[in-house]
From Swiss-Prot:
The keyword RNA-binding does not apply. WD repeats lie at residues 53-90, 94-132, 137-175, 179-217, 221-264, 269-311, 315-353. It holds the Pfam family WD40. SUPFAM superfamilies: WD40 repeat-like. SMART domains: WD40. This is WD repeat-containing protein 31. CDD domains: WD40. Keywords: Repeat, WD repeat.
């Protein structure tokens, strides 16, 4: 193991140890070189390069993976350039089912809570509804957008679906009937992502016009516009309690490339920014508290890095570089200690958080 150190202030060397997590399933063990940075409590930033074994499962997709989402504590659903939606057991390393029907790349997936059903969106302008326990054919096909569909969000009670597109339009659908019930359009509002606020009638939406909007699903009207950012907003995520949200910015060379924490309550102010990526931040998640002593968020970027941040202070606590993976496109929480990260070149990465000796994030499998 080669240890590189970049010190902000002098401190005695510390012992470095690594753990290996075994994941069962059809797999092959391979050696992988990975780089990560760790922000120690004494404010020293250590960059470490390690060679370790990780598990390579049978692949979920044969091309770039655009999106991944957790269906339940064992299964994820993903989509990509191969036009296929895949249900995968990431704990055993097995494909559960493949769903085919789209004519072009999958752009988004959204799962119905506590259900075996989920939706997919595509560059073919279609949205399809699938059932893990049904046939491999779509249960519903929703057609209403004039351009690629780039946003999907299911209401907390699972009765409605909101879709957004590059055609500047949002549509609200009745999940049972598959009929469109509301339509709204805002000039230059090229939708990049949608997220429904838990226990509320509100939908959060990011746009290429650099704006984060809050929509009221009752009539599908804009309820609030947050202050515009300097760069395209690529993604948004809402906390489980519905009090906060994160938006992500595109960028290059460290310009832009940040995530921003916003207050969704009365003030609706910007709370904190997370800066440290060097290319577009494509995804973000609020992490389960689990064993952590502080609230954490994670971001993934086109710079091949996943970062974990202190939600309250904006300090970067850990950086994992998934070398050779290309741009990281999507991030999802698998369980209390596991993350799923989709990539251009190496499929989906299974990452584990370890709190036993300070915070560490390790890649334990890829599929």
């Amino acid at each position: 193991m080669l240890l590189l150190r970049c010190q902000l202030k002098q401190a005695p060397p510390q012992k470095v140890s690594f753990r290996f997590c075994v994941v069962m399933g059809k797999q092959q063990s391979k050696l992988k070189h990975s780089t990560y940075k760790y922000g120690r409590p004494d404010e020293i930033i250590e960059e470490r390069i390690q060679t370790k074994a990780f598990q390579e499962y049978s692949p979920a997709h044969m091309d770039t993976v655009s999106v991944v989402a957790a269906l339940n504590s064992d299964l994820c659903v993903s989509g990509g350039k191969d036009k296929t939606v895949v249900a995968y057991n990431w704990k055993t390393g097995n494909v559960v089912k493949r769903f085919k029907g789209h004519e072009h790349e999958i752009t988004k997936v959204a799962c119905i809570p506590k259900s075996s059903q989920f939706f997919s969106a595509s560059r073919d302008r279609m949205v399809m509804m699938w059932d893990l326990h049904g046939s491999s054919q779509p249960r519903q096909q929703l057609c209403g957008h004039a351009m690629v569909v780039t946003g999907l969000a299911v209401s907390p009670d699972s009765s409605q679906l909101c879709t957004g597109s590059r055609d500047n339009t949002l549509l609200l659908w009745d999940v049972v009937t598959g009929q469109s019930v509301e339509r709204a359009s805002v000039s230059r509002n090229v939708v990049t992502h949608l997220c429904w606020v838990p226990r509320e009638p509100y939908i959060l939406q990011t746009s290429e016009d650099k704006t984060l909007r809050l929509w009221d699903s009752r009539g599908l009207q804009v309820a609030h516009m947050f202050p515009a950012k300097q760069h395209i907003q690529t993604y948004c995520e809402v906390s489980v309690d519905g009090h906060k949200c994160i938006s992500c910015s595109n960028g290059f060379g460290g310009e832009g490339c940040e995530a921003t924490l916003w207050d969704l309550r009365q003030t609706r102010n910007r709370i904190c920014e997370y800066k440290g990526h060097f290319q577009t931040v494509a995804s973000c998640v609020f992490l389960p508290r689990a064993l952590a002593l502080m609230p954490l968020i994670a971001t993934s970027s086109h710079d091949c890095k996943v970062k974990i941040w202190n939600q309250d202070t904006g300090a970067c606590l850990f950086t994992l570089s998934l070398d050779g993976s290309g741009p990281l496109t999507s991030l999802a929480v698998g369980d209390a200690i596991s993350l799923l990260c989709a990539s251009f070149n190496r499929g989906i990465h299974l990452l584990r958080m370890d709190h036993s000796q300070g915070l560490e994030l390790q890649e334990v499998a890829a599929f």
